[in-house]
């Protein structure tokens, strides 16, 4: 991931006091729905439009003196997503990766959390009442995990948006590793490399 190096969680936790830690979570749920009655949705994946106009995942900076990374992440989820985030808890078992950048000295920890479709829908419905809605978070969006017949609409077009940090790469890695796309469809994606 450009400008960032991957590191093990244990290494990230021992970087020292000059480093800040940010935790974010990809929330997803199986979705049996069909777009236009024929295109399988397969999964619902949430991202958010941030205050700076970029797409990212819910979460934010955490202070290790206040507890674990997960404690901080769950606090951030409550602030950004509202009461429905209290129906689940992101745990260490949901951890995926850590990446460090040197300027600024920030370690980005990434988690994925499987929810039920009902839980995910409750998050979407309650988010406009969350403390940070309209401030840090401008709204939630579902990632289209399909490609339309033109080969551009759907996920390829979505990936042309502007993402914060390495959120685009985290999304692609998670979608592939979790098997959220139809088998073989990831290899057929026409994805441009970001500038």
From Swiss-Prot:
Chain location of the short sequence motif Nudix box per the record: 61-82
Entry's cofactor comment: Binds 3 or 4 divalent metal cations. Acts specifically on U8 snoRNA with magnesium as cofactor. Has broad substrate specificity with bound manganese or cobalt (in vitro).
Binding site for Mn(2+) 4: 99, 173
Residues that coordinate or bind Mn(2+) 1: 59, 80
Enzyme class: hydrolase
InterPro entries assigned to the protein according to its UniProt record, in alphabetical order: NUDIX_hydrolase-like_dom_sf (IPR015797), NUDIX_hydrolase_dom (IPR000086), NudT16 (IPR054754)
Cross-referenced CDD domains: NUDIX_U8_SnoRNA_DE_Nudt16 (cd18869)
Cytoplasm recorded as keyword: yes
Annotated binding of Mn(2+) 3, by residue: 76, 80
Primary subcellular site in the record, as a coarse category: nucleus
Keyword Cytoplasm part of the UniProt annotation: yes
GO MF entries: 5'-(N(7)-methylguanosine 5'-triphospho)-[mRNA] hydrolase activity; cobalt ion binding; dIDP phosphatase activity; dITP diphosphatase activity; IDP phosphatase activity; magnesium ion binding; manganese ion binding; metalloexopeptidase activity
Catalytic activity: a 5'-end (N(7)-methyl 5'-triphosphoguanosine)-ribonucleoside in mRNA + H2O = N(7)-methyl-GDP + a 5'-end phospho-ribonucleoside in mRNA + 2 H(+); IDP + H2O = IMP + phosphate + H(+); dIDP + H2O = dIMP + phosphate + H(+); a 5'-end NAD(+)-phospho-ribonucleoside in mRNA + H2O = a 5'-end phospho-ribonucleoside in mRNA + NAD(+) + H(+)
BP terms from Gene Ontology: dITP catabolic process; mRNA catabolic process; NAD-cap decapping; negative regulation of rRNA processing; positive regulation of cell cycle process; sno(s)RNA catabolic process
Top-rank taxon: Eukaryota
Keywords: Cytoplasm, Hydrolase, Magnesium, Manganese, Metal-binding, Nucleotide metabolism, Nucleotide-binding, Nucleus, RNA-binding
Oligomer status and interactors: Homodimer.
Function per UniProt: RNA-binding and decapping enzyme that catalyzes the cleavage of the cap structure of snoRNAs and mRNAs in a metal-dependent manner. Part of the U8 snoRNP complex that is required for the accumulation of mature 5.8S and 28S rRNA. Has diphosphatase activity and removes m7G and/or m227G caps from U8 snoRNA and leaves a 5'monophosphate on the RNA. Also catalyzes the cleavage of the cap structure on mRNAs. Does not hydrolyze cap analog structures like 7-methylguanosine nucleoside triphosphate (m7GpppG). Also hydrolysis m7G- and m227G U3-capped RNAs but with less efficiencies.
Family: Belongs to the Nudix hydrolase family. NUDT16 subfamily.
Name of the featured protein: U8 snoRNA-decapping enzyme
